[in-house]
């Protein structure tokens, strides 16, 4: 329990823990390797202007434009908090479900907006992009774009690394411009270390490096 953690941390028995170990210890915080996105259902939000209005709402911008009379956000119970601007939208219903129920509702397309948690441990950023190919079973946006599909084909055949990176960036930008896939947040994991323990770091992909850890008694 918390009291036991604080006791262990105070006397040096506990050198590091993921979680909370008392106010006296400042954590090292890094990505947990998961990025949250909002996916907009293009079958229900078929007009680009409507999706862009939702995008502006998500960004907390004023003058968001014409929004649908009713919207449903499908999310997980343990997902990050809904942004204030979105939570205050009077025409929004938040449907926060356990994973199995969330998955069933997601597969049935019972949403206007979908909160999607995506692991960053893919070997290739193009994996996520392929979810939005017209024929993909994971196309939760119901997105159908010949331009985007052509971009994916070019990504798949490009062998020059820098050119391929540019194509991937362009495809991701297209999804954002058309308000289909919108980055929301990056999950964080705090690591609480004893004051004598230093040198532990975490990179943007959530990979912890303990190789440079040092303990000074």
Identify the role of each PLM range.
Residues 25-32, 38-48, 105-109, 130-157, ...:
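Short, solvent-exposed loop/beta-turn-alpha elements that line the ligand-binding surface or hinge
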Residues 71, 92-94, 182:
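Hydrophobic anchor at the start of a short beta-strand
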Residues 19-21, 42-43, 74-78, 117-119, ...:
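Structural motif
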Residues 3, 44-49, 77-81, 97-100, ...:
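Soluble non-cytosolic domains of exported or imported proteins
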Residues 5-26, 89-132:
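Periplasmic binding protein-like
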Residues 11, 33-77, 159-179:
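Alpha-helical secondary-structure segments
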Residues 79-90:
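Short, polar/charged alpha-helical segment
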Residues 54, 73, 86, 106, ...:
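Hydrophobic, well-ordered secondary-structure elements that form the walls
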């Amino acid at each position: 329990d918390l009291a036991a953690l604080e006791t262990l941390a105070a006397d040096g028995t506990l050198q590091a823990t993921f979680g909370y170990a008392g106010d006296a210890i400042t954590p090292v915080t890094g990505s947990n390797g998961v990025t949250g996105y909002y996916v907009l259902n293009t079958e229900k939000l078929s007009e680009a202007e409507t999706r862009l209005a939702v995008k502006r709402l998500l960004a907390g911008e004023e003058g968001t434009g014409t929004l649908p009379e009713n919207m449903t956000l499908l999310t997980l119970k343990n997902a990050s908090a809904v942004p204030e601007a979105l939570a205050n939208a009077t025409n929004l219903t938040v449907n926060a479900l356990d994973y199995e129920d969330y998955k069933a509702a997601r597969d049935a397309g019972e949403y206007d907006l979908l909160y999607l948690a995506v692991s960053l441990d893919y070997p290739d950023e193009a994996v996520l992009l392929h979810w939005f190919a017209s024929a993909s079973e994971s196309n939760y946006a119901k997105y159908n774009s010949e331009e985007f599909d052509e971009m994916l084909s070019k990504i798949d055949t490009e062998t020059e690394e820098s050119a391929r990176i540019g194509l991937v960036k362009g495809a991701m930008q297209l999804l954002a411009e058309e308000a289909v896939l919108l980055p929301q947040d990056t999950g964080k994991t705090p690591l609480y270390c004893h004051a004598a323990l230093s040198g532990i770091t975490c990179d943007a992909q959530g990979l912890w490096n303990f190789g440079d850890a040092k303990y000074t008694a």
